Amino acid sequence: MTEGIQNVSQPQIKIENLNLWYGEKQALKNVSMQIPKNSITALIGPSGCGKSTFIRCLNRMNDLINNCRIEGKVSIEGKDIYEPDVDAVELRKNVGMVFQKPNPFPMSIYDNVAYGPRIHGANKKDLDGVVEQALRSAAIWDEVSDRLKSPALSLSGGQQQRLCIARTLAVKPKTILFDEPTSALDPISTLRIEDLTMELKKDYTIVIVTHNMQQAARISDYTGFFLMGELIEFDQTRQIFQNPREKSTEDYITGRFG
């Protein structure tokens, strides 16, 4: 990996020499990165390069995969999340995740958003306010405020994805991971999610996996390029797209492979 950004004054997440294996297959190789607070970091690279595997290390989703082994260090706000005393459920409350395809629960719009706060012991009398605030923050309140008891699955794809973002926001995370959140959406819905993401970075640290080079260039502050399990280059997005240090980075973003 080229030098790029070495020391961030306020890193929300610090990754040091991260390696991951699925059985005998090594999927991540000596990945180190510092993700700044209240920023959008985009992860780009061809399919199978390790991007999604990497972000699942940031909230220990890989714990759920059999035969997965991890070495290295991932610190969030100075705390190593792989220490034995770390509660993975509490970690995932603080590091929320939005997936590639909208995955609302088969329940009402209201109950989708209230689900997480209920699990974490929210006071019943506070739920209405929590739900409204999350839906407003996800820019969907005006579209659903008069039908909160309707099935979430009755919403359009773009609305469902914003509902899933609201569901994530409802438990008040500090970091949000997006794994290709617009790949299943139409261009108009994609633009709304992008606008929302840029608005959310005021209050959250955001890491987004995307195959869309234009999307990464439009919305992110920092970009990391992965190839075959290695972080090839990590820098400010402007630097990556205008003057990459590595030829393989330039080849990828100009469409020579991928």
UniProtKB/Swiss-Prot annotation:
SUPFAM superfamilies on file: P-loop containing nucleoside triphosphate hydrolases
Function text: Part of the ABC transporter complex PstSACB involved in phosphate import. Responsible for energy coupling to the transport system.
Gene: pstB
Similarity comment text for this entry: Belongs to the ABC transporter superfamily. Phosphate importer (TC 3.A.1.7) family.
GO terms for MF: ATP binding; ATP hydrolysis activity; ATPase-coupled phosphate ion transmembrane transporter activity
Protein name as it appears in the record: Phosphate import ATP-binding protein PstB
Species this chain originates from: Methanosarcina barkeri (strain Fusaro / DSM 804)
EC id: 7.3.2.1
Membrane topology: Peripheral membrane protein
InterPro entries per UniProt: AAA+_ATPase, ABC_transporter-like_ATP-bd, ABC_transporter-like_CS, P-loop_NTPase, PstB-like
Gene3D superfamilies (UniProt xref): P-loop containing nucleotide triphosphate hydrolases
Family matches, as NCBIfam families: 3a0107s01c2 (TIGR00972)
Disulphide connectivity of cysteines: none
